[in-house]
């Protein structure tokens, strides 16, 4: 299961947004010309629309909160609690996603995951993030490192 379907959906969202923005820009420019507004007023409207577009970008394709997607996360075996759902969605086998007691393990985040017996499915993982590049380091699996774009995540298989 790759992230191909998600990527297509995000692209369609982006194209729709750009189409709407294009219509808004054109409408803004035509209204400014019809009302004989000065060029400086028209430019102010364009700048305002540009800022709104820039602020809307993270909403389109960021599974992580916009407040920490670009933050660097040094390599760690315990992801921050606010990011645990993100990391456990794409690396379900990582040990930090499971609570194990007496050999029975329950997933900390995904309620639809059944209880499992502690076994080789659960691997020791560490994670890191540098700008928009997220990585899992999985021990002792091969391949050892799973790279993904944080905004277009893929499942580790």
UniProtKB/Swiss-Prot annotation:
Keywords: Host membrane, Membrane, Transmembrane, Transmembrane helix. GO terms for cellular component: host cell membrane; membrane. The keyword Disulfide bond does not apply. It is a multi-pass membrane protein. It is found in: Host membrane. Its main location: host cell. It comes from the Viruses. The chain crosses the membrane at residues 14-34, 39-59. It holds the Pfam family v110. Plays a role in virus cell tropism, and may be required for efficient virus replication in macrophages. Belongs to the asfivirus MGF 110 family. This is Protein MGF 110-13L. It comes from African swine fever virus (isolate Tick/Malawi/Lil 20-1/1983). The lineage of its organism: Viruses, Varidnaviria, Bamfordvirae, Nucleocytoviricota, Pokkesviricetes.
């Amino acid at each position: 299961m790759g992230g191909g379907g998600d990527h297509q959906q995000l692209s369609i969202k982006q194209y729709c947004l750009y189409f709407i923005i294009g219509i808004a820009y054109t409408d803004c420019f035509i209204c400014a010309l019809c009302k004989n507004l000065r060029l400086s007023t028209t430019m102010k409207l364009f700048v305002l629309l540009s800022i709104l577009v820039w602020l809307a970008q993270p909403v389109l394709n960021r599974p992580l909160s916009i407040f920490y997607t670009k933050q660097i996360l040094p390599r760690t075996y315990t992801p921050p609690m606010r990011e645990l759902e993100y990391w456990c969605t794409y690396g379900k086998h990582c040990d930090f996603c499971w609570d194990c007691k007496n050999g029975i393990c329950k997933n900390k985040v995904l309620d639809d995951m059944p209880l499992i017996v502690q076994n080789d499915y659960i691997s020791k993982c560490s994670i890191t993030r540098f700008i928009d590049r997220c990585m899992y380091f999985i021990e002792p699996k091969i391949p050892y490192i799973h790279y993904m774009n944080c905004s277009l995540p893929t499942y580790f298989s």
